[in-house]
Structure formats: structure tokens, C-alpha cells
């Protein structure tokens, strides 16, 4: 028995959970999984603390939520942990089952099936199974046969995923066999030879599987899928036949789901109900089986009746053996890490925890006949043993023993014969399976025989023939004749008028030709032939007078089927032609078969059949007699066994007497061995005493020698001590020299890296500029003219519709003009749809080109990275090589441009896929819907036309905004390039300073080294060493005092640095003032134009012209200030150098300050660039866009009133509120008292009559819309208004507008058109 193995796997956060800002609540440690309830406060003790976190222990816990984590578990690791056991169990003969359980979107299908780049458990298990089969068959250790089937359970109905479309697609029934358990009736089983066959069937099944998109998952499995592998293996194990059959169920379950979370309705809701029903039943089965297992383990507890509801769902019925039956089962519980799915995750973990307690009873599935052979062999071996024991005692010459030996020999011969038959059967099976050109598959209750080669199928007129004869026509020539021919014939036939060498079938490149030989009788489709004839699919061939065949050519038939599908060949005419040909051929052939000859052959066959029947009866009689003889022999063996038991009892008595005698002898032997051991111990003790004396003498001698050596070493060390001190100081100076050189080299590299970064920054901005230009070209490619034409057409249609509406209001309805206007609108939509379709094709073609370019850039980048890695590894091996060190940065510089190009292409592709193409598809879908709905009412048509006009206006405004943004970006790029040139001058000066310092340090170190060398030579001449050491110490002290003086200089440098930072802040403030002046110029230009269209058309040229005058002025001031600051800093640095700043510590401090200053300048410039990029000129011209697209009727009876939908857009924020006319009037009265400028605005007057007339309401809508636009235009320019552009700038937002007036604030009832605003 074995319990169900349970593994838990957590997936990463998906996009939906990230949008909801979900928290991570799953932690895993080895086999433990912990879930945290964030709704319970942290820090609780007792029950509340335990309720906050719950810990479960499983067989395996797989953490797959973060690929960067060291505990990350990939698909490959999951297979190695679980899949290898499944493959091993299959080869051992056990059934196995793997299924994934969890809520929808938790990663079940990914774990089981995977995706194209990362296969799941099911493909990996199949691949592992066949790889092991190939390893085994390579050494001819065993034979194998593998069948697969693939089904899905959709809405509690079983469907065969590998069957062709038929009427029985969802009508497969589930039955239960008394011994083999549940099975699916008429489920197709497919024989496979390798993993490629399995993969092909799996892909075909996955295409047919039912999936759909839900609110929680884009591709959600709407059915349970079971992929079953029936694996049979046969081999000889120690000369014993062995045949096992294993079934592997690989299950991909649909996920449990809640209707409110997925947003399911209609069919999706019904599917979800059936999915939840089967999963609830699965949970009930798991609970019941866990209770049964716990009752079985607790023997003292009272047994209770537990019912396992297998048949409550099709899923649990088919998995009956896998749950608590004959199978080794693995359950993978997939969970989400987000707190928004806490309830579903906890439920999954609890079910998985209960499944651990299920106890299965797996057994090896051995073939019944093989099992019988093995048991018979065991019985023969046992009888042989008994017979041998009996012969040794008293039955050596008895007739009973001789008779028993004879019967045993007969049984052995019979076992050998059965084994041989079993071996021949498997050899034939393997030969058929290895034949790649012939495939046998089951189709319903029938069997289909598929062949790849051209072949002949025999049409036998013998009524007693039961087989199907198929002859392959191999490449080359196939000879046909009788068995008495002089040469061996490939196809041997018998019959009237058949020559010994009759004809030849020649197959050259798939073209088959029939060549009759020397007067032989051959007919094709009833026509006698005497020369080579080309054969076509379906031809009927007669050889002689009695051998008829049908010729099949699979490739030619496939081509004909394709033609029939494409309409080139009518199926009706093709079938009638085939029928007529078959009828003519058969009738022509029957002319050659006389009735008498047929009756004679039939009588001969009946006589043969009668003789065979008699032979069978004789064999049955013989078998009965053999069976009776075997029973008699078994009775004799039983009596012999009883006699043998008596003899064995006598032998045991004799063995006991022998044991007593041997015990006495062993005691004597032990006494002798004890005396011998005593003697050996005395001899060893004497030897040890002699060795101890010898060892003491050796130790004393060794100590004396060691003392003498120690004295000599001390003398030698005293002589070397003074020399060692000098060398140590020399090494210390050398180290300091190397450190100084290393630091200077680092400074040089830092300056070079700064230069590269600045160049890359300029290149990046240039890339952005080019990207924006191409993006605008992409959007403007003929679209502006097209949009303007459509807008003009829509204005004409709208005028016609308004005339019809005015005529209807006056009581004079013109139906013909309404119909013409609607026809014009529909014709406009058709033209628009055609243009959209053409544009979609262009975009799709452009998308393919971009994908191809991205793939090429990725390949180039991978090649460059591989070369860079190889050179890096070579540099690690050869660090001392100076020439190799410069090659790696050069390779890195090659990689950077390729990465930028790749990022640019990917951004282009992403913009096309996420923005342009979806917008186009949405517009095309809207056009389709309008055309499908047909003619609309006047109001609906007018609403659609006005909506289209508003969209066209927004598109034109967007095009103008992109053009303005491109001009701004180009100005920013020029500004940044100018800054980069000034930075280049600063870096050159800094490099010159570093080189001069490096030269001074090198000279100082060379002088110190020369002094030490002189000291060493003086020591060699035995001069006074103490004076030299004291002199060097005094020099070092003087150096230390010099360093203290340099610290004062360092303080002054820091003060200068602070002053420099203050000047830079002043510079930034001046730049900000210049930008503010540009914004004010934009505001002045905007005041000169009345309408939105006029502003967009006429304000772009003056603003750009003014900006072009201001930008050079701003650049000139910045350049002058930077140049002045550079010169001042260089003078300060030269002054510090002249005063003696030469030590390494001070040098490093200065360089660090220089580096920090450069970084600060760079960050400051980047901030200025980012600000300039973030400011959209079009947004500053028209930051608030407001419109009233429609009005709706709310309330009933006396409370009925019209509400206007007000759509407000502030920069990139858009929202909608519904307000009635009285709210507009209240806002105007309230704000008019605060801001006098509003009194000059014209507010739509109140009317006593006609307030519910739609014509009046339509006019009021346009008046209110104009009022709101004028209202914001005044407020943005008013100095007393909180919305003034100089006060808010880019901080203008939805919050600012709502704080200005509650009229624009969205209330509780503003989320639909049924509010009371």
C-alpha cells in the first residue's frame, strides 16, 4: 500500500493581481507551506495569532513565484521530482496518475501541459518514457507497445479529442468492467512509436479542447482533460517471460471559480457550474477516502460506514482506481500567492492536506498467461526438490519416482512450448510495430489500416476467406508469379492462366507501372493490356483469371481529396465515376470466372475445411486425454509429496543427533584455543618491554640533536634579522607605489567612463528623437487627410439629419430625406470599414516586419554577448596581459548600440500592438456593429454621427500635439548636446591635472626607492645601520607633518565646493525662470484665438517661432556661465597643486570631490532634461477639455427631468458627471459672486415652457457646452482664479478642479446615467 503523494506549487503574481495591488501571503520552507491572513492584525497571541498564519506540511512544496529566488523551482525540477517516479512506476508495471488541483488561473494547465518554450509534466513524462524505451531497445532487452487516448469532460459529457468530427462527439458512454474498472466506450486508442507521434496527437487534441476567456484568466480551461498512456512491456528476466501492462492517467483539471470573480454569464456560467460540481464531488471523494484511511489506521476506534460518491460525477468515476485503488497517485495543488484569493487558496491547501491521508493499493499488472507460466515453473522446481530429496533417501529406484520424473519432463516441455509461443507472438507484434509504412488504428468499433506506400488489396472470390491481403509495392521492381518460377518471386499467386513469371510492378518516384511478361494475361479496369500501363488510384487489376486486386496510391488519393475540398473536383462526380469504374471492372472480371470452375474450387475448399475440422476434433480429444493424464500425475505427485515429508522428518532427527555430537567437539576445540591465546599473550608482553627500552634511548638521542639544531637556528636568525627589516621596508614602499598607480589608473578609468556615459546620454536622446519622428510618421501616413475628409462627410450627414429633425418637430416629416441621410451614413461606414481593413493589413505587415527585425537584433546581441563572455573568461586566465585588457570594453561598446536598437524596435512593436492596432480593431468592430444593426432611428443616427465627429476632432488634435512635442524634444536634444560639449572641456582639464600629479608621485617614489637601495648597499659594506634608519624615520615624520598641512588645504577646497554648488542652484533657478517665460508666451498666443480648431491650427507657428528665439538665448547664458565656472575651478586647482598637494590621501580626496561635483552636475542636467521632456506643449495650451456629448431622461411622472453628461479631461485624467440644468445655474450664480470676470459670460436663460421638449434640450446642451468652455478659458487667464496657469502649471489635476467647485466632483450617483445630479 502507498499513500497519495501531494505537492503544492505557488505561481507568480499575474497582471490582474498586480493591478489590484495584492499582497504576497505565501511562504515556503522545504516541505512546509504557510499562508497568512492579512485581515487579522499582526502581533496577536493565542487563538488570534494561530488564526493569522496557518502552516501545512506536504510531500513537496514548490516555490515558483520568483525566478530570481534561490529556491525557485522550474518545470524541469518539478519533472525530476515527480515525473521520474511516474516513468519508473510504469516500467515496474504499476498504474500511475498525476493530476493538478486548484482554482482557475492558478497554473494547473501550465504545470501539466506547459507552453511552447517550457513543456509541462505531461510532455516531459511522455518524452522520458520513450527515451527510456529507446535506451532499452538499443540493447534488445525488452519489447514495448504503447497506446494513447485523449478525452475531455465538458458539461459532464465525455468527448474524444483525437476522433474526427462526427455526430458522436459528445455521446461517449462510461461503463464499468467487473475486473478492469471504469472505461469509456468507443474511445479511440492510437498506437504510437516515438515521442513525435505523441506530440502530434497531443497538439491535435489540445486544438479540439474547449477553452474560453474569463474575468480571471485570458485562456481558461472549460473542461477536464485526461491523457491516458497504456504501456505494455515484454522481456525475459532470468529465462522467465515477463509481460506487464501499465496505465498512466495524466489529468489537467479545469479550475474552480466564482461567478462574481470571473464575471461569467450565459454559457460560461453553465460551464462554471458543471466544473464546480465535478470538483466538489472530487473534494467529497477525497474527504471520504481520507476518513476511510484514518479508520483503517485506528484499529481501536469503532468502524463507521463511509460512502465514497464516485458516481456523482464523470471525473471521479473515471479516476476511481487512481483515488484509493490500484495506482500510484500524485496530486499537485496549484495556488495563487495573492491575498485577494485567500479563501480559494486556503480551501485548496485544506483539500491537499486531506488527500495526504488517502491510501492506495498499487499492484503490478502482470499478464495472466505469463503469471500462469511462472507459477507452473515454481511448482515444477518445488517438485524437483522434493524428488531429489526422496531419491537420496529411499526412492532412488522406485517406479513411482521414475514415473514422476517422466511427468516432470513432460511438464517442462509444455512450459517451454508455451514460452516459445509467447515469444513468437511478441516477435511478430514487434515486427508489425517496427514497420513504419503500416499503421493500425481503431476508429469506433472498426479498425482502419493505413499505409504510406502504394499497395495492392486482394479481392478474393472465395466465400470462406476471412483475411485481408495487402501487398506493398516497394521502390523499384516487384515481381509477381508462381512459386515454381526459376527466380524467387516477391508476390506468389495461384490460379488459372497464371504464368510462372507473370508480370512486374515498377515503382519509380511514386509512379507505378504494370509491365506484363511474355503473353501473360493482365487486365486493368477490365481492359486487356500487352504493354506497360500507368496505374492510377482505385484501378482494378486482374492477373490471370482468378486473382483480382484493387490498386491504392495514398499520396495520389491525398491530392485528390485536397482538390475535392478546394472545389477543383466535384465530390459527386468523383464518387459516381469511381462507382461506374468499379462496376465496369467487376463486371468485366466476372466474365473471366466460369461458374463450373468456381463450384469446383468451392467443393475443394469445403473438403479441406472438413478435414481441418476433423483434425481439430482429434486435437481436442488429445487435449482432454492429456488433461486427465496431468490430473492423474498431480495426484501421484501429491502422494509422493506426503511420502517425502515422512522421509524429511527422519532426516531432521538424524541432523539433531549430529548437532549434539558436533557441540561436544566444539567445546574441546575452544579449550585448546584458549590455552594457545594465553601463550601468545605472554610472548607479546616480552616483545613490548624490549621495544619500549629501545624507544626511550632513541628519544633521548633525538632531544639532544634538536637542542643543538635550535641553537644553530637562533644564531642564523639573528644574522638575518637586520637584512629582513630593510627588505620589509623596501616591500612596503613598493606596495605604496603600486597602490598610488592603481588609484591613478582608477581615476583615469572613471573619467573615461564619464565621457562614455555622456556620449551614450546624447545618443539616447538622439534615439528618442528619431523614435518620436518615426512614430509621428507612422501615425500621420495619410491619416490626417483621411480624417479631415471623413469629418467633412460627417458634417454633411449631420446637417441633413438636423434638417429632418427640425422638419419632424414642425410636423412636416420628410421620410425620403431621412432615408437618404441614413444611406449616406451607411455608405460612409462602408468606405470607412474598407479603409480600416486596408490599414489593418498594412499594420499587420508592419508588425511582422518589426517582429522579424527584433528577432534579428536579438540574435546579433546574443552573438556579441557570447563573444564578450569568451573574451572575459580568457582575461581571467591571463590577468597579466596588458593588450587583452582593452578588448573587453571595446566589445562592451559594440553591445550597447545593439541593445539600444533592440529596445527601440521593441518599443515600436509594443506601441503598435498595445495602442495603434487595438484602437484600429476597436473602430473596425464598431463599424461592423453599426452595419450589422441596419437602419437606426433618427436620434440614434444623429448621436452616432456626432460621436464620430468628436472622435475625428480628438484625432486631429492628437496629431497636432505630437508634432509640437517633437519640436520640443528637438530643442531639448540641442540643449543637452551643448552641455555635453562643456563637460568634455572639464574632463580634458581634469585629465591633465591627473597626469601632472601622477608624474610628481612617480618621481617622489623613485627618490624614496633610491634611498632604500643606498641603505641596502651600505648594510652590505657593514656600515652603520642605525643612523640610516633614524634618517628615514625623520623623513617619514616630515611627510606626516606635511599631510597635516594638506588637511587645511582640504578644508578650503570643501568651502569652495559648497560655493560652487550654490552657484549651480542659482543657474538652475534662472533656467526655471526662462521656462516660465516660455509658458507665458504660450498663454499669450492662446488668447488670440476663439475656437478649439482655430487654436490648434494657428497657434503652433507663433509659439514655435517665439520658442526658437528664446532657446538660443537660454543656451547662450548657460554656456557662458559654465565656461566661467570651468575656468575658475581650473585656476583653484592649479593654485592648490603649486602649494604642494602631492600626497596620495589628499589626491584621492580631491578626485572624489571632483567626481561628486561632476555627478551632481550630471544629475542636475538630467533632471532638467526630464522636466523638459515631461512638459507637453499642447497640454499647456489647452489643459482642460470639456464637452457635453449627450443628455438622458431621468425619473418618472412629476419628477421626470433631463440630465446632461459632462465629460471633463484635465491633462491625462478624464471623468464624467451627470448634472441637471438647475445645478449649472447654481454654480454660475455662486462663482459669479467670487469672480467678477464670470459676469460677462452669457449663461443659457431659464425657460418657463418647453423644458421637456427635446429640441429645446438639444439647443440647451450646445449652449451649456459653449458656456463651460468659455468659463474655463476665463478662469485659466484670471489672476484671481486658483486655476491660473502661473499658479498651478503642470500640477493642474482632477483634484484641483474638484476643489475649485463641487459641481465637477463625482458623487455616489454619478456612476451611471440614472443618477439624480
UniProtKB/Swiss-Prot annotation:
GO terms for molecular function: ATP binding; ATP hydrolysis activity; microtubule binding; phosphatidylinositol-3,4,5-trisphosphate binding; phosphatidylinositol-3,4-bisphosphate binding; phosphatidylinositol-3,5-bisphosphate binding; phosphatidylinositol-3-phosphate binding; plus-end-directed microtubule motor activity. Keywords: ATP-binding, Coiled coil, Cytoplasm, Cytoskeleton, Endosome, Lipid-binding, Membrane, Microtubule, Motor protein, Nucleotide-binding, Phosphoprotein, Transport. Gene3D superfamilies: 2.60.200.20, Kinesin motor domain, Phox-like domain. The keyword Ribonucleoprotein does not apply. PROSITE patterns: KINESIN_MOTOR_1 (PS00411), KINESIN_MOTOR_2 (PS50067), PX (PS50195). Residues 370-425, 595-882, 936-1087 form a coiled coil. Residues 478-529 form the FHA domain. Disulfide bonds: none annotated. The modification Phosphoserine is found at residues 398, 582, 1052. Primarily expressed in brain. Also present in kidney, liver, intestine, placenta, leukocytes, heart and skeletal muscle (at protein level). One of its GO terms (cellular component) is microtubule. The modification Phosphothreonine is found at residue 577. Changing residue 1249 to A: Induces a 5-fold decrease in PtdIns(3)P-binding and abolishes endosome localization. Induces a 25-fold decrease in PtdIns(3)P-binding. Residues 1036-1057 are annotated as: Disordered. It holds the Pfam family Kinesin. Changing residue 1225 to A: Induces a 3-fold decrease in PtdIns(3)P-binding. Its main location: cytoplasm. It comes from the Eukaryota. PANTHER family: KINESIN FAMILY MEMBER 16B (PTHR47117:SF8), STAR-RELATED LIPID TRANSFER PROTEIN 9 (PTHR47117). Interacts with RAB14. Interacts with PTPN21. The PX domain mediates binding to phosphatidylinositol 3-phosphate (PtdIns(3)P), phosphatidylinositol 3,4-bisphosphate (PtdIns(3,4)P2), phosphatidylinositol 3,5-bisphosphate (PtdIns(3,5)P2) and phosphatidylinositol 3,4,5-trisphosphate (PtdIns(3,4,5)P3). Does not bind phosphatidylinositol 4,5-bisphosphate (PtdIns(4,5)P2). Plus end-directed microtubule-dependent motor protein involved in endosome transport and receptor recycling and degradation. Regulates the plus end motility of early endosomes and the balance between recycling and degradation of receptors such as EGF receptor (EGFR) and FGF receptor (FGFR). Regulates the Golgi to endosome transport of FGFR-containing vesicles during early development, a key process for developing basement membrane and epiblast and primitive endoderm lineages during early postimplantation development. Belongs to the TRAFAC class myosin-kinesin ATPase superfamily. Kinesin family. This is Kinesin-like protein KIF16B. The gene is KIF16B.
Amino acid at each position: 500500500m502507498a499513500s497519495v503523494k501531494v505537492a503544492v506549487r505557488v505561481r507568480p503574481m499575474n497582471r490582474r493581481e498586480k493591478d489590484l495591488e495584492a499582497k504576497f501571503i505565501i511562504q515556503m520552507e522545504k516541505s512546509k507551506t504557510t499562508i497568512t491572513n492579512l485581515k487579522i492584525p499582526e502581533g496577536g497571541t493565542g487563538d488570534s495569532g494561530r488564526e493569522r498564519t496557518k502552516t501545512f506540511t506536504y510531500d513537496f512544496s514548490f516555490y515558483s513565484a520568483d525566478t530570481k529566488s534561490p529556491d525557485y523551482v522550474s518545470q524541469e525540477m518539478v519533472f525530476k521530482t515527480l515525473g521520474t517516479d511516474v516513468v519508473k512506476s510504469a516500467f515496474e508495471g504499476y498504474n500511475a496518475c498525476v493530476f493538478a488541483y486548484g482554482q482557475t488561473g492558478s497554473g494547473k494547465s501550465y504545470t501539466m501541459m506547459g507552453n511552447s518554450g517550457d513543456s509541462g509534466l505531461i510532455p516531459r513524462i511522455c518524452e522520458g518514457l520513450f527515451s527510456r524505451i529507446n535506451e532499452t531497445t538499443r540493447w534488445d532487452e525488452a519489447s514495448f507497445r504503447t497506446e494513447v487516448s485523449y478525452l475531455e469532460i465538458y458539461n459532464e459529457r465525455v468527448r474524444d479529442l483525437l476522433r474526427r468530427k462526427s455526430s458522436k462527439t459528445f455521446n461517449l458512454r462510461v461503463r464499468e468492467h467487473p475486473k478492469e474498472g471504469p472505461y469509456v466506450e468507443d474511445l479511440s486508442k492510437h498506437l504510437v512509436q516515438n515521442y513525435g507521434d505523441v506530440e502530434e496527437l497531443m497538439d491535435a487534441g489540445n486544438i479540439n479542447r474547449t477553452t474560453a476567456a474569463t474575468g480571471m484568466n485570458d485562456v481558461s480551461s472549460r473542461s477536464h482533460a485526461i491523457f491516458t498512456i497504456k504501456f505494455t512491456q515484454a522481456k525475459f528476466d532470468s529465462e522467465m517471460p515477463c509481460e506487464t501492462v501499465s496505465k498512466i492517467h495524466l489529468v489537467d483539471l479545469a479550475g474552480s471559480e466564482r461567478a462574481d470573480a470571473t464575471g461569467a454569464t450565459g454559457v460560461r456560467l453553465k460551464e462554471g457550474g458543471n466544473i464546480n460540481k465535478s470538483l466538489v464531488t472530487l473534494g467529497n471523494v477525497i474527504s471520504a477516502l481520507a476518513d476511510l484511511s484514518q479508520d483503517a489506521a485506528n484499529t481501536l476506534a469503532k468502524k463507521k460506514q463511509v460512502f465514497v460518491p464516485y458516481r456523482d460525477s464523470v471525473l471521479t468515476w473515471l479516476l476511481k482506481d487512481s483515488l484509493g485503488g490500484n495506482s500510484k497517485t500524485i496530486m499537485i495543488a496549484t495556488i495563487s500567492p495573492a491575498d485577494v484569493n485567500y479563501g480559494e487558496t486556503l480551501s485548496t491547501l485544506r483539500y491537499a492536506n486531506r488527500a495526504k491521508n488517502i491510501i492506495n493499493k498499487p499492484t503490478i499488472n502482470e499478464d495472466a498467461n505469463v503469471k500462469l507460466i511462472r507459477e507452473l515453473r515454481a511448482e515444477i522446481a518445488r517438485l524437483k526438490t522434493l524428488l531429489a530429496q526422496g531419491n537420496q533417501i529411499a526412492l532412488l529406484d522406485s517406479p513411482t519416482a521414475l514415473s514422476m520424473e517422466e511427468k516432470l519432463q513432460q511438464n517442462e516441455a509444455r512450459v517451454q512450448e508455451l514460452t516459445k509461443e509467447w515469444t513468437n507472438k511478441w516477435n511478430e507484434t514487434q515486427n508489425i510495430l517496427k514497420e513504419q509504412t503500416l499503421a493500425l488504428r481503431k476508429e469506433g468499433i472498426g479498425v482502419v489500416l493505413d499505409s504510406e506506400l502504394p499497395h495492392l488489396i486482394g479481392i478474393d472470390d472465395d466465400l470462406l476467406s476471412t483475411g485481408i491481403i495487402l501487398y506493398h509495392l516497394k521502390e523499384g521492381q516487384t515481381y509477381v508469379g508462381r512459386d515454381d518460377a526459376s527466380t524467387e518471386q516477391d508476390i506468389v499467386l495461384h490460379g488459372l492462366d497464371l504464368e510462372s513469371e507473370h508480370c512486374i510492378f515498377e515503382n519509380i518516384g511514386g509512379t507505378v507501372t504494370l509491365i506484363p511478361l511474355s503473353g501473360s494475361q493482365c487486365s486493368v479496369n477490365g481492359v486487356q493490356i500487352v504493354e506497360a500501363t500507368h496505374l492510377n488510384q482505385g484501378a482494378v487489376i486482374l492477373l490471370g483469371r482468378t486473382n483480382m486486386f484493387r490498386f491504392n496510391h495514398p499520396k495520389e488519393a491525398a491530392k485528390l481529396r485536397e482538390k475535392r475540398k478546394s472545389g477543383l473536383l466535384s465530390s459527386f462526380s468523383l464518387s459516381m465515376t469511381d462507382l461506374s469504374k468499379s462496376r465496369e471492372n467487376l463486371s468485366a472480371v466476372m466474365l473471366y470466372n466460369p461458374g463450373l470452375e468456381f463450384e469446383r474450387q468451392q467443393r475443394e475448399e469445403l473438403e479441406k475445411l472438413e478435414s481441418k475440422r476433423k483434425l481439430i476434433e482429434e486435437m481436442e480429444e488429445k487435449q482432454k486425454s492429456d488433461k486427465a493424464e496431468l490430473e492423474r500425475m498431480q495426484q501421484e505427485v501429491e502422494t509422493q509429496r506426503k511420502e517425502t515429508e515422512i522421509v524429511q522428518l527422519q532426516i531432521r532427527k538424524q541432523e539433531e543427533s549430529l548437532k549434539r555430537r558436533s557441540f561436544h567437539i566444539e567445546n574441546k576445540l575452544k579449550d585448546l584455543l584458549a590455552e594457545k591465546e594465553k601463550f601468545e599473550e605472554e610472548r607479546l608482553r616480552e616483545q613490548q618491554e624490549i621495544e619500549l627500552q629501545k624507544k626511550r634511548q632513541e628519544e633521548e638521542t633525538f632531544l639532544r640533536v634538536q637542542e643543538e639544531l635550535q641553537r644553530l637556528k637562533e644564531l642564523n636568525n639573528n644574522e638575518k634579522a637586520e637584512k629582513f627589516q630593510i627588505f620589509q621596508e623596501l616591500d612596503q614602499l613598493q606596495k605604496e607605489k603600486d597602490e598610488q598607480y592603481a588609484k591613478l589608473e582608477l581615476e583615469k578609468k572613471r573619467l573615461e567612463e564619464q565621457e562614455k556615459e555622456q556620449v551614450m546620454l546624447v545618443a539616447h536622446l538622439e534615439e528618442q528623437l528619431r523614435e518620436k519622428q518615426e512614430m509621428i510618421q507612422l501615425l500621420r501616413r495619410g491619416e490626417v487627410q483621411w480624417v479631415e475628409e471623413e469629418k467633412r462627410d460627417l458634417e454633411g450627414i449631420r446637417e441633413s439629419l438636423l434638417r429632418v429633425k427640425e422638419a419632424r418637430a414642425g410636423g412636416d416629416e420628410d421620410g425620403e430625406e431621412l432615408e437618404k441621410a441614413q444611406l449616406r451614413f451607411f455608405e460612409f461606414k462602408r468606405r470607412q470599414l474598407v479603409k480600416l481593413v486596408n490599414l489593418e493589413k498594412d499594420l499587420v505587415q508592419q508588425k511582422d516586419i518589426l517582429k522579424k527585425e527584433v528577432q534579428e537584433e536579438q540574435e546579433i546581441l546574443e552573438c556579441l554577448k557570447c563573444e564578450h563572455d569568451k573574451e572575459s573568461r580568457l582575461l581571467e586566465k591571463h590577468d597579466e596581459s596588458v593588450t587583452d585588457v582593452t578588448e573587453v570594453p571595446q566589445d562592451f561598446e559594440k553591445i550597447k548600440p545593439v541593445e539600444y536598437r533592440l529596445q527601440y524596435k521593441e518599443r515600436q512593436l509594443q506601441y503598435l500592438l498595445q495602442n495603434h492596432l487595438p484602437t484600429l480593431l476597436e473602430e473596425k468592430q464598431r463599424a461592423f456593429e453599426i452595419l450589422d444593426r441596419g437602419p437606426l432611428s433618427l436620434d440614434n443616427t444623429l448621436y452616432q454621427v456626432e460621436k464620430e465627429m468628436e472622435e475625428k476632432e480628438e484625432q486631429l488634435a492628437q496629431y497636432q500635439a505630437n508634432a509640437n512635442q517633437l519640436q520640443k524634444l528637438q530643442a531639448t536634444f540641442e540643449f543637452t548636446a551643448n552641455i555635453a560639449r562643456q563637460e568634455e572641456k572639464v574632463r580634458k582639464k581634469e585629465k591633465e591635472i591627473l597626469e601632472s600629479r601622477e608624474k610628481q608621485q612617480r618621481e617622489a617614489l623613485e627618490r624614496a626607492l633610491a634611498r632604500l637601495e643606498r641603505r641596502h648597499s651600505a648594510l652590505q659594506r657593514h656600515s652603520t645601520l642605525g643612523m640610516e634608519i633614524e634618517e628615514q624615520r625623520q623623513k617619514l615624520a616630515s611627510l606626516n607633518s606635511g599631510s597635516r598641512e594638506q588637511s587645511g588645504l582640504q578644508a578650503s577646497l570643501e568651502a569652495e565646493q559648497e560655493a560652487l554648488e550654490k552657484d549651480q542652484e542659482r543657474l538652475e533657478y534662472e533656467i526655471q525662470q526662462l521656462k516660465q517665460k516660455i509658458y507665458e508666451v504660450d498663454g499669450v498666443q492662446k488668447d488670440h484665438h476663439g475656437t478649439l480648431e482655430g487654436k490648434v491650427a494657428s497657434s503652433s507657428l507663433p509659439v514655435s517661432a517665439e520658442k526658437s528665439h528664446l532657446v538660443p538665448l537660454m543656451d547662450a547664458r548657460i554656456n557662458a556661465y559654465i565656461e566661467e565656472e570651468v575656468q575658475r575651478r581650473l585656476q583653484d586647482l592649479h593654485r592648490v597643486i603649486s602649494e604642494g598637494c602631492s600626497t596620495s590621501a589628499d589626491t584621492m580626496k580631491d578626485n572624489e570631490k571632483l567626481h561628486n561635483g561632476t555627478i551632481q552636475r550630471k544629475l542636475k542636467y538630467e533632471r532638467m532634461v526630464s522636466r523638459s521632456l515631461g512638459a507637453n506643449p499642447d497640454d499647456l495650451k489647452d489643459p482642460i477639455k470639456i464637452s457635453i456629448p449627450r443628455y438622458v431622461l431621468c425619473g418618472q411622472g412629476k419628477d421626470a427631468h433631463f440630465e446632461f453628461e459632462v465629460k471633463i479631461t484635465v491633462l491625462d485624467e478624464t471623468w464624467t458627471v451627470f448634472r441637471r440644468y438647475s445645478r449649472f445655474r447654481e454654480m454660475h450664480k455662486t462663482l459669479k459672486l467670487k469672480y467678477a470676470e464670470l459676469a460677462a459670460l452669457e449663461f443659457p436663460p431659464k425657460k418657463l415652457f418647453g423644458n421637456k421638449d427635446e429640441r429645446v434640450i438639444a439647443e440647451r446642451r450646445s449652449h451649456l457646452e459653449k458656456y463651460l468652455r468659455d468659463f474655463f478659458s476665463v478662469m485659466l487667464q484670471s489672476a484671481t482664479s486658483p486655476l491660473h496657469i502661473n499658479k498651478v502649471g503642470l500640477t493642474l489635476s482632477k483634484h484641483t478642479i474638484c476643489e475649485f467647485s463641487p459641481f465637477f466632483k463625482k458623487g455616489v450617483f454619478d456612476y451611471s446615467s440614472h443618477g439624480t445630479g
